């Protein structure tokens, strides 16, 4: 009995290693996603964002965006960048996620929320380039402390950018960033994440003082 069990474990080990290796290489190694956050005034706790991604896995027919705990999402939209076609989007919560048979990669709780974007099932060799836009409200991660804006969020994608609200300038960033100014005068921070995990980004900023007339 013990010999049979040991043999089974020996046979299972290479399979488990191969599956783990495939999981590590299949998504992150080819990922070209980028995301841009446009911060609204900090007292609103809200920010708009868009992210681009290319889906190329055969048989895939939807994209799931699981909303982080403590956040709420509104106005989700998705378009095919190659054609401009708008895709059907729905937001599911709690029991509706279970009823739809959707696996969000974590236990489904009453407060769980996921944005589901559906598209025709991809054939072998086919790719789909998407742009997804949403508005989030997250008082725990985006707030005003005294006169200082605080944005505290982890980034998992390779390329991430944050655009400060109009009139704000950067005071601190916990992660190295490239600063630039947008055409409408807003400060933009670009982050690169070369790691297979997340970077914890903490940004603080203050509002510029109005210039007084001479």
Regions found by a protein language model. Give the residues of each.
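A surface-exposed beta-strand-loop module
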Residues: 75-78, 82-150, 182-214
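Solvent-exposed beta-hairpin/edge-strand motifs
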Residues: 61-101, 152-176
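Early extracytoplasmic/domain-onset interaction patches
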Residues: 19-67, 114
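Beta-strand elements of well-folded, non-transmembrane domains
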Residues: 41-45, 51-59, 68-70, 121, ...
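Positively charged n-region of N-terminal signal peptides that target proteins for export
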Residues: 1-4
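Intrinsic-disorder/low-complexity, polar/charged segments enriched in Ser/Thr/Lys/Arg/Asp/Glu/Gln
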Residues: 34, 46-50, 59-63, 114, ...
């Amino acid at each position: 009995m013990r010999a049979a069990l040991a043999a089974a474990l020996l046979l299972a080990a290479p399979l488990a290693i191969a599956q783990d290796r495939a999981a590590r290489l299949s998504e992150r190694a080819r990922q070209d996603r980028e995301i841009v956050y446009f911060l609204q005034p900090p007292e609103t706790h809200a920010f708009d964002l868009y992210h681009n991604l290319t889906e190329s896995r055969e048989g895939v027919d939807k994209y799931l965006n699981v909303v982080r705990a403590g956040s709420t999402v509104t106005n989700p939209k998705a378009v095919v960048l190659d054609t401009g076609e708008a895709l059907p989007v729905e937001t599911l919560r709690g029991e509706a996620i279970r009823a739809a048979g959707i696996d969000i990669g974590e236990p489904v709780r009453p407060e769980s929320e996921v944005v589901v974007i559906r598209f025709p099932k991809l054939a072998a060799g086919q790719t789909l380039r998407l742009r997804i836009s949403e508005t989030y409200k997250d008082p725990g991660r985006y707030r005003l402390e005294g006169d200082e804006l605080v944005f505290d969020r982890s980034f998992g994608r390779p390329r991430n950018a944050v655009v400060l609200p109009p009139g704000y300038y950067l005071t601190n960033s916990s992660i190295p960033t490239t600063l630039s100014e947008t055409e409408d005068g807003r400060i933009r921070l670009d982050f690169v994440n070369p790691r297979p995990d997340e970077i914890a980004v903490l940004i603080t900023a203050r509002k510029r003082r109005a210039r007084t007339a001479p």
